[in-house]
Amino acid sequence: MLETRCKYYKDEAMFHGFIPHIMGTRFDILLIHSDAERLNGLWTHIINELERLDKILNRFDPHSEVFGINKHALQSYIQISKELEKILQLCQYYYENTFHLFDITLKDFSKIQIHDHQRISFMSPDISLDFGGFAKGY
């Protein structure tokens, strides 16, 4: 179970939500609104979304989609979710438009092949995906 903390500061109409460890980092959010109940509901939605994305993009979680890709994409084509395919295409766009400075691999994005029908493969044994710099802003 994910450890979370939150507190509503009535005098400031401010809500602070905190998750000490998700996606390899801590997560803090400040929300401003006078309706504490509404903010609590929004916080629950945010937690659920962060947990969902963590199950896709966390390269250290053996149950995540990216962990499986990093483990098997060199041996064969790996089927990926539609969302991960869109994320990879977006990351490829950033890679190409930043003169290769933005790179979600630990080596060289050009060694990833994104195939039709939501499939991916790696062309080199030293490639792995790391969304640490991307996932937090996604």
Where do the PLM segments sit?
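A contiguous, well-ordered beta/alpha segment that forms the leading edge of an enzyme domain
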Residues: M1-G132
